[in-house]
């Protein structure tokens, strides 16, 4: 995972295209217009109702005018004609309006319209009949009245006058209420009047004629009037009006429902459009945020470009990257902790601002527990700032914590601190924080691997140089051991022969002392070539330092003060105390050479716990428990340009004063053999400090005598020791040493010579054989079977002999040169075994 994010097609999918939003806006506007626009033609509907009401009014006015015309109140028939014309016009307008209206006109409406037309036509016919006959009737009534009024003046008889009065009374009754009886009675009176004319024949004749006209026309006029008065035009118009109102009401209800529905649809579309626009704006803002995040990732990558693979560059790069993350999320602080998955301790921590925060253990453990228990990729929590860092309880603010598994061993916990309580978190921001944290962890891991790779390359290069030097030095040291063995052997024998103090004895002592120093140099060379046999046992570093403290004081100059400091914790390690002794001797010797005047060397032994991985000057040390052996001085210090090369073999800044360049190289070799780590810090003019981290041991420590043995040299009791050495000079030296130790030596040049000697029935208690005399690929068990006894192999530091679990009891390997005491211990140990 590289921590980078590229917007995908899914990120740009907002749920609606711009043209679809525009279509929804148009649809919402159309639905809104349909909802606010009236579907019915209200003007037409009102005109229909007006025409129906006008028909009612015109019909009533027509009936009124007909009654007035019948009563003779009006003699002009023009109002009746105009009313009738208005009625017909209203009917035509009504038909036209019904065609224009949106009312649903069914059969009922059509039938009512037809009935209304028929009623108007019937009324028209009745009015026409009424008009023609009513004129005649009114003329007849007028003539009848005039004749009746002049008849008494012209008649000469009282009977005629009486009959005319009776006739006038009957005619008045007939006009008011026509009936067949009155008609017969009036006809009878007219006949009677004609018979008794009494000289008034003209008035009587007019009276009789007009009377009979009235009797014949008045019923027809009354019928026409009754037909007009009983016309159902108004009733049909009222029924039609009710039907229209019902249809209008029903259509209004339907229209209202439809408008409510359309309005609801329009409102719903508007809400949906608003939500789409809101989502589109949020998505746009989110994509803008993602693009800003891409720039942040690029800036984080730039922070880790170059700078070199060092701890300081890693810290500065991580600090700059956290500052970018802090600025991106508008936080007040930003910190990152890499916590070990197992022990839940912060292995590394970084912060955007210095100093780094002190993480609260409870918060770390809680987040680690949640991250381990949760199957999801990350765990998000919001906590008070004082619960995340070791801050005072009154510290305000909150912290946004995100924990996720960075690797199989580490859990990354990122903290964003906010002043006050203005934190606003959302899933998108948490996702971006997770991606940014993963990206940062990726770059940190890459930088760490780069650092480790560079360190491994330097160590490999250093190991290759050591191997090359060791290969060369091993061959040279082997030849020197042969020469030095002869020198020390003869010197020790001469020393044993000269018991008294003399000049010769002192010279021999100097020879042995110089030989011992030469042997130490050869041991250092063999340390570089890894050709020394190591005996490892648990021992206390504190006890060892106290044991060799007098030796260290004697080895240093008088102007140098040596101080020791030990803590109460156990400082048991597993290894060889000789290696620790040699490390201290070399470090103290180097420190003493750094003083031009008085100085002080501090040796401290302590037990420490390293909570996170630590980058040293020459390697990387994992977190854990260690025994720390520190040697520090206040001398001149080491130059920065020299510091990377101090552990290289034969590198020295004091070649003119006899420096060999093997001391610190041997120290580095011993530390590696003890599976430890070494770190050095130095400042010119202020001093140097060497810190040696050794893995502790839980075993019970042994006493120093288990390594160094007692002071008295063990001697033999005449046991036969066979010796195989092709070099006659060395063979003679070894024979003299063996004889001086109380044993009976028998020397042979080859293994075959020894086997021939054994085949003759001879038997040796022990066999000493030089490495060069052994055939290749022969096991120690085969030697034991051939020699019939145990063997001691001289110069066996680089022996390529196959060993089994039983071989160690049948052979012992001694590196050259061999001192008399070492040989005495080896022979006595194998013979007793």
Swiss-Prot record:
The chain crosses the membrane at residues 19-39, 260-280. It is a multi-pass membrane protein. PROSITE patterns: HIS_KIN, RESPONSE_REGULATORY. Residues 475-698 form the Histidine kinase domain. InterPro entries: DAHL, HATPase_C_sf, His_kinase_dom, HisK_dim/P_dom, HisK_dim/P_sf, Sig_transdc_His_kin-like_C, Sig_transdc_resp-reg_receiver. Activates VirG, by phosphorylating it, in the presence of acetosyringone or hydroxysyringone. This is Wide host range VirA protein. The gene is virA.
């Amino acid at each position: 995972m590289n921590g980078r994010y590229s917007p995908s097609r899914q990120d740009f999918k907002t749920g609606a295209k711009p043209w679809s939003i525009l279509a929804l806006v148009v649809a919402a506007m159309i639905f809104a217009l349909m909802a606010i626009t009236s579907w019915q033609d209200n003007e037409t509907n009102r005109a229909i109702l007006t025409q129906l009401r006008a028909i009612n009014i015109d019909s009533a006015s027509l009936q009124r005018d007909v009654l007035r015309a019948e009563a003779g109140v009006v003699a002009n028939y023009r109002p009746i004609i105009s009313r009738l014309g208005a009625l017909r016009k209203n009917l035509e307008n009504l038909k036209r309006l019904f065609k224009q209206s949106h009312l649903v006109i069914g059969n009922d409406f059509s039938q009512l319209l037809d009935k209304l037309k028929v009623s108007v036509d019937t009324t028209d016919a009745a009015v026409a009949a009424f008009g023609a006959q009513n004129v005649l009737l009114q003329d007849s009534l007028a003539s009848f009245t005039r004749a009746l009024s002049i008849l008494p003046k012209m008649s000469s008889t009282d009977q005629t006058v009486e009959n005319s009065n009776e006739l006038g009374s009957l005619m008045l009754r007939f006009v008011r209420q026509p009936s067949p009886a009155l008609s017969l009675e009036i006809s009878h009176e007219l006949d009677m009047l004609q018979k008794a004319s009494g000289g008034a024949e003209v008035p009587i004749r007019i009276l009789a004629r007009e009377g009979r006209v009235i009797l014949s026309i008045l019923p027809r006029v009354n019928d026409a009037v009754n037909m007009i008065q009983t016309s159902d035009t108004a009733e049909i118009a009222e029924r039609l009006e009710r039907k229209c109102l019902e249809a209008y009401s029903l259509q209004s209800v339907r229209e209202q429902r439809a408008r409510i529905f359309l309005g609801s649809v329009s409102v719903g579309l508007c809400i949906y459009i608003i939500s789409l626009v809101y989502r589109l704006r949020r998505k746009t803002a989110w994509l803008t945020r993602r693009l800003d995040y891409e720039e942040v990732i690029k800036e984080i990558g730039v922070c880790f470009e170059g700078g070199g693979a060092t701890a300081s560059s890693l810290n500065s790069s991580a600090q700059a990257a956290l500052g970018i993350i802090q600025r991106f999320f508008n936080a007040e602080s930003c910190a990152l902790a890499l916590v070990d998955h197992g022990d839940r301790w912060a292995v590394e921590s970084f912060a955007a601002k210095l100093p780094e925060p002190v993480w609260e253990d409870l918060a770390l453990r809680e987040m680690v527990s949640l991250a381990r228990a949760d199957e999801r990729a990350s765990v998000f929590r919001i906590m008070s700032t004082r619960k995340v860092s070791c801050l005072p309880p009154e510290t305000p603010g909150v912290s946004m914590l995100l924990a996720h598994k960075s690797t199989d061993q580490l859990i990354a916990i990122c903290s964003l601190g906010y002043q006050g309580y203005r934190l606003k978190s959302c899933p998108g921001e948490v996702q971006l924080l997770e991606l940014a944290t993963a990206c940062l962890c990726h770059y940190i891991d890459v930088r760490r691997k780069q650092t480790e790779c560079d360190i491994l390359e330097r160590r490999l290069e250093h190991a290759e140089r050591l191997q090359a030097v060791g290969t060369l030095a091993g061959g040279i040291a082997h030849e020197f051991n042969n020469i030095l063995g002869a020198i020390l052997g003869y010197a020790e024998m001469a020393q044993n022969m000269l018991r008294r103090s003399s000049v010769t004895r002192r010279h021999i002592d100097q020879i042995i002392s110089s030989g011992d120093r030469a042997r130490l140099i050869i041991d250092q060379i063999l340390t570089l070539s890894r050709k020394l046999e190591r005996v490892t046992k648990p021992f206390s570093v504190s006890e060892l330092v106290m044991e060799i403290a007098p030796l260290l004081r004697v080895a240093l100059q008088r102007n140098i003060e040596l101080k020791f400091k030990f803590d109460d914790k156990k400082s048991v390690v597993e290894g060889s105390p000789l290696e620790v002794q040699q490390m201290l001797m070399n470090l103290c010797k180097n420190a003493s050479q750094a003083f031009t005047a008085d100085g002080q060397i501090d040796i401290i032994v302590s037990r420490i716990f390293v909570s996170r991985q630590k980058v040293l000057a020459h390697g990387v040390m994992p977190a854990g428990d260690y025994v720390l052996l520190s040697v520090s001085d206040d001398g001149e210090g080491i130059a920065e340009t020299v510091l990377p090369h101090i552990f290289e073999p034969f590198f020295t800044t004091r070649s003119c004063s006899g420096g060999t360049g093997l001391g610190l190289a041997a120290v580095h070799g011993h530390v590696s053999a003890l599976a430890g780590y070494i770190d050095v810090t130095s400042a010119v003019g202020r001093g140097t400090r060497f810190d040696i981290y050794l893995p502790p041991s839980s075993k019970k420590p042994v006493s120093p005598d288990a390594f160094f043995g007692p002071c008295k040299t063990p001697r033999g009791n005449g046991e036969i020791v066979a010796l195989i050495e092709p070099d006659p000079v060395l063979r003679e030296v070894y024979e003299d040493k063996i004889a001086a130790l109380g044993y009976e030596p028998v020397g042979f040049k080859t293994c075959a010579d020894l086997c021939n000697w054994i085949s003759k029935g001879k038997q040796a208690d022990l066999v000493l054989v030089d490495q060069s005399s052994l055939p290749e690929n022969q096991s120690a068990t085969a030697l034991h079977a051939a020699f019939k006894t145990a063997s001691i192999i001289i110069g066996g530091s680089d022996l390529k002999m196959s060993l089994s679990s039983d071989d160690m009891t049948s052979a012992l390997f001694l590196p050259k040169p061999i001192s008399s005491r070492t040989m005495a211990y080896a022979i006595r140990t194998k013979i007793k075994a």
